[in-house]
Amino acid sequence: MELVEVKQELAAMAKRLTDFRGSLDLEAKQERMAELDEFMTAPDFWDDQEAAQTVINESNGLKEQVNVFLELEEKYENLEVSYELVKEEADEELEKELEAGVKELISRLNDFELQLLLSEPYDKNNAILELHPGAGGTESQDWASMLLRMYTRWSEQRGFKVETMDYLPGDEAGVKSVTLLIKGHNAYGYLKAEKGVHRLVRISPFDSSGRRHTSFVSCEVMPELDDNVEIDIRTEDLKVDTYRASGAGGQHINTTDSAIRITHLPTNTVVTCQSERSQIKNRDQAMKMLKAKL
């Protein structure tokens, strides 16, 4: 990269940072952070743990966004200094460092811009992701397990926490259905575009004739909603079933009827949860999933 190109890239980055600062409204965000910090120091802050966690998540999200932006600005200023030094006196080693720094900052600015674009009402929420294989038996179930590994690894690489809410293993391989709760700032914003039917065409390892098979898996993505979102669900509209948990888990698996299945009769919407030892906790999680679906 020539010095002329470096200068052009630095000018473009300066404009982007100015635009970001304008859209971020740093002063308003810093005021909100101060408000949240005050809430968190209140003696009764932990009386309502769910509300407390919502405040903590909002605070962490704001702090991360503001701190990352300030870090990007500092990185840009350092690159400007390096550029001036190289312009005054040629230094091959410093030129290489400058070029690498410019490329890295461009990449980080692109990531930051994507985060700013995730500004829809529920983008910042945790995500509930469901995978359901289509017709095709073991072949589709194996494809579902591949997608499960992909989403799990992607989430872990981004620093998100993954919890398995419901898991039904396949008869020979793969999974018949799985529901994940993916926790992290902007988890739903990043994952919402994954909703739809995912198709795989391959020579099947389960077909002794080596024929080509097409497999389908439907993917549902919903935001996890907190109690601030009011959805009227009447008790008489619900059918609640309990059953024994299955799949990977602790000692409670297959020993108690801790798993919950809730059917919303007017819409025939069904949700299941078996991730917790407690039937009460599974019911709470299932109700959150039902609210998200409705």
UniProtKB/Swiss-Prot annotation:
Compartments in which it is found: Cytoplasm
Pfam families, per database record: PCRF (PF03462), RF-1 (PF00472)
GO cellular component, one term: cytoplasm
SUPFAM superfamilies membership: Release factor
GO biological processes: viral translational frameshifting
Post-translational modification: Methylated by PrmC. Methylation increases the termination efficiency of RF2.
GO molecular function, one term: translation release factor activity, codon specific
Name of the protein: Peptide chain release factor 2
Protein family membership: Belongs to the prokaryotic/mitochondrial release factor family.
InterPro entries referenced in this protein's UniProt entry, alphabetically: PCRF (IPR005139), Pep_chain_release_fac_I (IPR000352), Pep_chain_release_fac_I_sf (IPR045853), PrfB (IPR004374)
Keywords: Cytoplasm, Methylation, Protein biosynthesis
